[in-house]
Amino acid sequence: MTDSDYPWEPPLAGTEAEHLAGALDRLRTTFRWKADGLDSTGLQARLGVSELTLGGLLKHLARVEDEIFTVKLTGEPMGAPWDSIAWGGETDPEFASAADDSPEQLYALWDHAVARSRDRLAACLANGGPDQLVHLATRDGRQASLRRLLCDLIEEYGRHTGHADLLREAVDGRVGEDPPPRWTPQS
């Protein structure tokens, strides 16, 4: 196998920005592989008393991508479809509302959010490194760095890729740490 068989792998000896973006993309790819190719039943399957579903995770992570790379990065609003959701309850409404979306809508929502995030990150990195300050700030005015946003998103994907691993195994037995060589989404 060659490096081109696993394009989602971070570089062996890259810059800090390349490693952060690479680690994030590896988790994104693994998550997408775990969620890929399912119908509505598979995307809505639950384990035990948990309300988590792969469909809910697709929608949640799409929202997190948009929130980090708009609101937190630049202070801009997220826009559609997030501006029409009633926020403020005990749980994230995107988890429950995913049951109303088709598999095609959920996959497209996540895929487009990730594409937007990659474009926004590339534009941001063209103007500086991970230490540049972003819009997100504490109440006393201390601003977060781009590094912090990337680490937060890596943490979010790490948590939910683990959830996706368990959910997918329960749906159809798919197991594994990494997608197969040259994998691309099928749905």
Where are these regions (language model features)?
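Acidic/histidine-rich alpha-helical segments that form the ligand environment
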Residues: 90-133, 145-157
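Short, contiguous alpha-helical
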Residues: 2-9, 17-36, 40-92, 133-187
